[in-house]
């Protein structure tokens, strides 16, 4: 009975316990077609065969039933029982049209069925056309999914299709449905006297906005007034989105689904319809607007001696751009110069104290694109954080902190009020240790004895490396050691900012958590405290949508960088090695911040290179030549693949060749 056959059979014996267990998770699909359900809290993913997807697609939130538990490994196999929420309903791809029927072939590297398109839903699409299609029906996996053409792209719309594809792949709807737009149209822009008497009136207090030159929505304004006691009151006034977006309405559901606006180089996919974001809630100059405000009274020493929170009505006297305010700060001249200069001094002091108290001063670089009429990039610059940006940043941080502190002290039946905090955990030790070794090799001491020591070490390192070749690499590696900031009702503080209490209150036009915060704060002020039992689930959803938006924004930036570099094929650039791996090293160009890969294969003509992980370096086995993180190199643009959003570089051993000015 101990035959090899019996032994083999015993290894695959299925444990038949707990097979009624179901889990909720997210479906990931490998290139092979196999599925894996990622469940929060489970150490191992649940394996699902393609025949058990039950119409689920990559990224869908699903409910899965366990069908088998493998003996020995304990690995679970399952079957999708229900699709809780589809990640993506719009897809980019190509049309294939027959005599009596048509199919849409999705542009994806992951296995996905073709979508049947009824002939009356083609909207004029022809075979070979690049289109966006919306999934409208898929009753069961024995039938083809059904959809309709949303948009047809001509060659000159290549950029438009790419941006829409990125947004759709990230699970964000491309348009608002008719019900949402119709609801938004019904909202009145008239402010009634009855509404004004319910609010604190700031219409006669000096108020202004400071925003980018091309901003279309202004969701925050600052007021400034001298009080009779000699103190100064600063008001942070935020568009009162929750007044217009009531829970359970069509527009609220659409906003929650998105949870955030998505900002791409040439467009914005807003969380709210433009009727709300760009009109009703935009704090435009010379218009009365409804706001939700946090004000703080500051004495002669800069100490906050009193705070107030509540609904207000304002009248913005002036719209400043960041450039306007920066000019006033530098020249000491301009409209409302006294107020601007006082706020500049005050916020620089806030900033200084914040870093002294443990905040970390990472200065990540943000690229900006100059685009032609068709959306093609013709220039890339790096956005600078100047004093004018810091003025607004510090006031917003202070308002968010004060609101969170206030709500942290509210009790409901002797229990802490559930509240959507913005939290940031301490660095991961496994990620931190290699970074510390790398920093010390470059001559930068690093103390990891406590969280405070870590924060101060990061700040000292950033200061000491400023202007040096390795600065950007150290910043990027340092950021990678950090945990991701998330929304949760479990307040563990915000390590990166050095705050014990923090939330997002100041951008409800573009972030749904801010809407949740406004509603809860108002319920506390009204004495009818909102205790949302589903709040943690909403926090998790908002965190996931935020990550998806960031991935879309990174993908769009990468697309634009690759598109820009197509015009520079064969040209050489100075760069900094920004990453090393067994398959090559990544280089970021100094001039344009475009990152590409120098493959190990392209280096083989020089030497046989191997990765030394502890050194973050590739080392030649014969020559000993090292490519270290942070090294300056010269690279030639070898390939620019728009479909994959990838740049290939080749190392230039002899320096700058064919450099294009």
Features from the language model and the residues they span:
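Charge-lined substrate channels and their catalytic hotspots, especially those that engage the 3′ end
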Residues: 1-233, 242-288, 617-623, 628
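Electropositive polyanion-binding surfaces
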Residues: 21-23, 137-139, 155, 159, ...
């Amino acid at each position: 009975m101990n035959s090899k056959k019996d032994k083999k059979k015993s290894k695959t014996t299925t444990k038949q316990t707990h097979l009624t267990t179901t889990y909720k998770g997210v479906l990931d699909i490998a290139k092979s077609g196999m599925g894996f359900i990622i469940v929060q809290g489970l150490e191992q993913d649940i394996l699902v065969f393609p025949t058990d997807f039950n119409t689920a697609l990559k990224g869908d939130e699903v409910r899965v039933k366990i069908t088998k538990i493998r003996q020995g490994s304990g690995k679970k196999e399952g079957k999708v029982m229900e699709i809780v929420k589809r990640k993506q309903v719009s897809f980019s791809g190509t049309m294939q049209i027959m005599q009596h029927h048509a199919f849409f072939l999705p542009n994806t590297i992951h296995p996905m069925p073709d979508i049947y398109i009824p002939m009356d839903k083609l909207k004029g699409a022809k075979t070979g056309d690049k289109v966006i299609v919306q999934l409208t029906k898929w009753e069961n996996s024995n039938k083809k999914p059904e959809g309709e053409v949303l948009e047809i792209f001509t060659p000159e719309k290549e950029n438009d299709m790419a941006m829409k594809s990125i947004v759709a792949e990230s699970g964000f709807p491309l348009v608002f449905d008719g019900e949402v737009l119709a609801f938004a149209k019904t909202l009145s822009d008239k402010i009634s006297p009855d509404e004004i008497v319910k609010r604190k009136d700031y219409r006669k207090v000096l108020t202004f906005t400071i925003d980018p030159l091309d901003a279309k929505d202004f969701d925050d304004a600052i007021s400034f007034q001298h009080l009779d006691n000699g103190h100064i009151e600063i008001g942070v006034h935020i568009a009162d989105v929750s007044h217009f977006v009531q829970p359970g309405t069509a527009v609220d559901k659409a906003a929650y689904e998105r949870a955030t606006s998505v900002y791409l180089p040439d467009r914005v996919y807003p969380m709210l319809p433009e009727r709300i974001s760009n009109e009703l809630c935009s704090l435009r100059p010379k218009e009365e607007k409804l706001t939700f405000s946090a004000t703080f009274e500051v004495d002669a020493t800069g100490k906050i001696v009193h705070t107030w929170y509540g609904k207000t009505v304002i009248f913005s006297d002036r719209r400043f751009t960041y450039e306007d305010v920066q000019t006033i700060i530098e020249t000491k001249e301009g409209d409302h110069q006294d107020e601007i200069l006082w706020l500049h001094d005050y916020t620089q002091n806030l900033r200084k104290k914040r870093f002294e108290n443990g905040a970390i001063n990472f200065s990540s670089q943000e690229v900006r694109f100059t685009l032609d009429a068709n959306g093609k990039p013709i220039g890339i610059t790096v956005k600078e954080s100047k004093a004018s940006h810091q003025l607004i940043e510090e006031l917003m941080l202070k308002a968010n902190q004060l609101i969170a502190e206030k709500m942290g002290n509210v009790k409901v039946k002797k229990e802490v009020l559930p509240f959507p905090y913005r939290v940031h955990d301490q660095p991961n030790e496994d990620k931190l240790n290699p970074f510390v070794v790398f920093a010390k090799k470059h001559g930068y001491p690093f103390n990891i004895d406590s969280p405070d020591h870590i924060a101060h070490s990061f700040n000292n390192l950033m200061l000491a490396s400023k202007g040096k070749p390795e600065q950007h690499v150290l910043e990027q590696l340092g950021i990678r050691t950090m945990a991701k900031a998330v929304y949760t009702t479990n307040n563990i503080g915000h390590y990166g900012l050095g705050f014990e209490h923090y939330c997002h209150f100041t951008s409800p036009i573009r972030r749904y958590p801010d809407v949740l915060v406004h509603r809860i704060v108002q319920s506390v002020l009204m004495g009818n405290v909102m205790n949302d039992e589903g709040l943690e689930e909403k926090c998790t959803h908002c965190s996931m949508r935020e990550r998806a938006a960031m991935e879309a924004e990174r993908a769009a930036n990468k697309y634009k960088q690759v598109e820009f570099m197509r015009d520079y094929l064969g040209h050489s650039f100075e760069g900094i090695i920004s990453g090393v791996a067994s398959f090559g090293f990544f280089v970021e160009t100094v001039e344009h911040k475009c990152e590409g890969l120098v493959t190990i294969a392209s280096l083989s003509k020089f030497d046989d290179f191997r990765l030394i992980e502890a050194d973050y370096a590739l080392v030649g086995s014969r020559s000993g030549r090292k490519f270290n993180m942070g090294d300056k190199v010269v690279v030639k643009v070898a390939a620019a693949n728009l479909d994959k959003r990838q740049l290939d570089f080749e190392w230039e051993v002899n320096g700058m060749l064919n450099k294009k000015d």
